[in-house]
Amino acid sequence: GWSGSYWTMSKYIRQAYIFMDNVKALPKQNVTESDVETMKNECRFMVAYYYWMMTLAYGAVPYFEDDMTSDSPDLMRGQKSFEWMIDWLDNQFLELSKVLPDSWSTLYGGRATKLAALALRARILLFAASPLVNGNEWYLGFKNSDGEERFSQAYDANKWKKAADACKQLIDEAEKKGKGLY
């Protein structure tokens, strides 16, 4: 079943990295290189989604760009700041929107698509622009292991512009695909 705990999310991220490291084309089973690339992009989508869930719940989180084993010296790393995670998520979902398919047949419903990546990106940027984390002094003094602030206390009006642009991009792309607001 579903569990949104930190440990479950980390496990899901690791499983996606293991899959990406090991998936191969299998011509005899009709699994092509194109299929493999699609599966890897879907894993990247899920990794970014799980990092978003952790960032939403915890703010600053440890970030790993590949599989970590329990004996890795890098396993006990510090947290990346909330702003760093938001920038990374923004870039991931924007890149994924360029390589994921526009849609899937109903047989494959629920899989990652271009519009899903753009929608998550817009939602993430809206949250990052909100007063909860944009200039909120409640987080003053919350530092990571490197002594960096976990959250910026400086209000940045440009975050709203970036969020609005992401929402506009999503709406425009959705309308191109026949999925308008009304």
Regions found by a protein language model. Give the residues of each.
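Short beta-alpha connecting loops at secondary-structure transitions
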Residues: 73-77, 148-151
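Conserved, well-structured interaction surfaces
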Residues: 1-58, 74-109
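An aromatic- and glycine-enriched ligand-binding surface/loop that stacks and positions planar moieties
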Residues: 1, 40, 59-61, 86, ...
